[in-house]
């Protein structure tokens, strides 16, 4: 699985200018996602962040490869949790048409924001838990606020819990949980086709909780609530 590395976002079944690029499966040679450039980076005592652009490229065109989608990732890591065995970062992605042609993401069982666990996490050395309390055998294609993957490396457990923002398309999003491979993805296209058009980019936000041991559901629920409805301050004139 050449395409399953770390954290990534790609779609499987798409329609673009009469072709069907598969941006997920790199080995088919018909499409790919590539880094395009760095737009911004900053850091301070509260958070550090960077912004990058990625191109979703159709390789099966009659002429030269053609960029179908421009995707901007804003990644922000928060200075919290280190003394309690966890860290926290957010990814906000904006996916826009690269030109006048729309892209239709077709109904599919997987494809979207994804995460792959360590090679050592195959089989019983990997566990899943969702916000609905589902484990690996029952979680696949259920709709969730968050999903956690954890595994054992040299006898030590650790994991990541990914939280979907309530403003995301089709929230609570379905989640694809693989029966044997240590990966999962949020897959809004499981509920049917959707379009990305020149005048309407797709904006998605996720929070990543990186933790020692297995996830504590109460802690994940609290952090999801903080993500979904952060505290707000208002200045009121007397």
Identify the meaning behind each predicted range.
Residues 1-18, 115, 196, 205-206, ...:
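N-terminal small-residue-enriched
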Residues 2-85:
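Extended, loop-rich substrate-binding clefts of extracytoplasmic carbohydrate-active enzymes
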Residues 38-48, 81-85, 152-157, 167-169, ...:
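A short, structured loop/turn motif at beta-sheet edges
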Residues 51-55, 72-74, 92-96, 114-116, ...:
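Residue-level recognition of well-ordered beta-strand positions that form the cores
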Residues 59, 98, 211-213:
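Short coil/turn motifs at secondary-structure junctions
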Residues 78, 82-127:
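Acidic (Asp/Glu-rich), glycine- and aromatic
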Residues 108-115, 120-190, 195:
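Trp/Gly-enriched beta-strand surface patches
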Residues 161-237:
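Beta-strand-rich recognition/accessory modules
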């Amino acid at each position: 699985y050449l395409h399953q590395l770390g954290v990534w976002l790609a779609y499987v079944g798409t329609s673009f200018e009469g072709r069907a690029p598969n941006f997920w499966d790199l080995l088919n040679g018909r499409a790919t996602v590539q880094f395009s450039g760095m737009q911004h980076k900053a850091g301070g005592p509260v958070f550090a962040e960077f912004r990058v652009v990625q191109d979703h490229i159709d390789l099966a065109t009659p002429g030269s490869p053609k960029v179908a989608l421009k995707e901007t990732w804003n990644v922000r890591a928060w200075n919290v949790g280190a003394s309690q065995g966890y860290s926290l970062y957010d990814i906000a992605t904006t996916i826009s048409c690269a030109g006048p042609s729309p892209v239709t993401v077709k109904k599919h069982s997987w494809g979207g924001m994804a995460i792959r666990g360590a090679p050592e996490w195959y089989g019983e050395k990997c566990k899943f838990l969702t916000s609905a309390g589902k484990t690996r055998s029952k979680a696949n294609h259920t709709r969730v606020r968050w999903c956690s993957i954890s595994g054992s490396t040299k006898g030590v457990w650790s994991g990541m819990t990914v939280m979907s923002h309530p403003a995301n398309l089709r929230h609570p999003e379905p989640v694809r949980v693989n029966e044997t491979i240590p990966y999962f993805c949020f897959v809004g296209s499981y509920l049917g086709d959707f379009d990305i058009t020149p005048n309407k980019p797709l904006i998605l936000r996720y929070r990543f909780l990186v933790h020692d041991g297995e996830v504590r559901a109460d802690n994940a629920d609290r952090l999801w609530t903080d993500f979904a409805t952060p505290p707000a301050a208002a200045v009121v004139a007397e």
